[in-house]
Amino acid sequence: MSVSIVREQSITISDGIRLDSGRILAPITIAYETYGTLNTDASNAILVEHAWTGSAHLAGKQSENDTKPGWWDAIVGPGRLLDTDRYFVICSNVIGSCFGSTGPASINPKTGKRYNLTFPVITIRDMVRAQKLLIEMLGIRRLLSVMGGSMGGMQTLEWITQYPDAIASAVLLATTPRPSPLAISMNAIARWSIFNDPTWRKGEYKNNPKDGLALARAIGHITFLSDESMQAKFGRKFSARDGQFDFFGQFEVERYLDYNGYSFVSRFDANSFLYLAKALDLYDVSWGYESMAEAFARVSAPLQFFAFSSDWLYPPGQTEEMVSCLRKLGKEVEYHLISSSYGHDAFLLEHEAFSPLVKRFLDAAYAKGGQ
């Protein structure tokens, strides 16, 4: 059963936070949604981390007229993986994004204008630093679990290394300890698409630079898929409306990318896209440490990792590198390689493949009372 109508909430922290860059971002607003009820000792809270272009709207609908539920609706609700009769589930929008939390589209209180490119560069660690303040303000000392895929997995890595005493377990899916040169290259091309749109105006646009942002999204979307899934979905079919010898005729896959690119423009801010892409590229779990091993030496919670066989953006070997390091340190870690043809997006599309394993893992954490 899905959750019922949910409402977005927010908190504002007037003192803000000190960022990894050394700058102070203040005030900050954090948008979030919750599902279920926090128990009396606040031991049943699970924080779910969203990916690059996600939001706090994890599940359910925000009004009766909503046509689409939240981005991971299938796993949240009574009797589902994240059972809201048992757990208090939280999802917040990261700072730097554009769905209610402070980002480049927010108003700078010092100028009364949008931050745009005066917004400071942020890191994944900065995002989690803000989340930690939210969790404390909700009266939660220790999270039963933190769970996330892709960029959400990077945030989860920061929780297990920066705040090991604040979590009792963690689930990480389709993530990486650091993006590869290939991943950075794809993001670079996406950035250039926006930079070269004349309507971007170095971030000072009135309306989203639609052509640049649509192309950037299409480039990113390709990295979320796989050759196998694209062959199955599209093959080499031409659009029924386009002739093979029409110069502007399109393959079905082209029409798909065109639709996904331009539909994205209406819901996401171009500058936020750029700032979050920068945060992704900068990410390295060992930043500030001598090595990954030194970072992972801080881990105290049991961990569960998932990789997906056809994910070429953050391929299984990158997860296996982390798992190997953690096991050498004697940490409690599970690893599951899921056979899938869906590429990087498998963590969103094939929850049935990992849900029983995650349920067992969370059941064990819950049985310990979040200790």
From Swiss-Prot:
Q: What class of enzyme is it?
A: transferase
| Assigned keywords, A-Z | Acyltransferase, Amino-acid biosynthesis, Cytoplasm, Methionine biosynthesis, Transferase
User: What's the catalysed reaction?
Assistant: L-homoserine + acetyl-CoA = O-acetyl-L-homoserine + CoA
Q: Which GO terms describe its cellular component?
A: cytoplasm
Please state where this protein is localized.
Cytoplasm
The record's listing under SUPFAM superfamilies reads: alpha/beta-Hydrolases
GO annotation (BP), single: methionine biosynthetic process
* Keyword RNA-binding (UniProt): no
Boundaries of every AB hydrolase-1 domain copy: 44-350
Q: Which Pfam families match?
A: Abhydrolase_1 (PF00561)
Offer an example of a GO molecular function term for this protein.
homoserine O-acetyltransferase activity
Q: Which residues catalyse the reaction?
A: S150 (nucleophile), D311, H344
Q: Where does substrate bind?
A: R217, D345
Provide the E.C. number(s) assigned to this enzyme.
2.3.1.31
Q: In which pathway does it act?
A: Amino-acid biosynthesis; L-methionine biosynthesis via de novo pathway; O-acetyl-L-homoserine from L-homoserine: step 1/1
**Where would you say this protein principally sits, based on its record?**
cytoplasm
Q: Does the keyword Cytoplasm apply?
A: yes
How does this polypeptide assemble, per the annotation? Homodimer.
What does this gene product do? Transfers an acetyl group from acetyl-CoA to L-homoserine, forming acetyl-L-homoserine.
Family statement: Belongs to the AB hydrolase superfamily. MetX family.
- Quote the NCBIfam families the UniProt record gives: homoserO_Ac_trn (TIGR01392), PRK00175.1 (NF001209)
Recorded protein name is Homoserine O-acetyltransferase
Task: State the organism of origin.
Answer: Pelobacter propionicus (strain DSM 2379 / NBRC 103807 / OttBd1)
Q: What gene is this protein translated from?
A: metXA
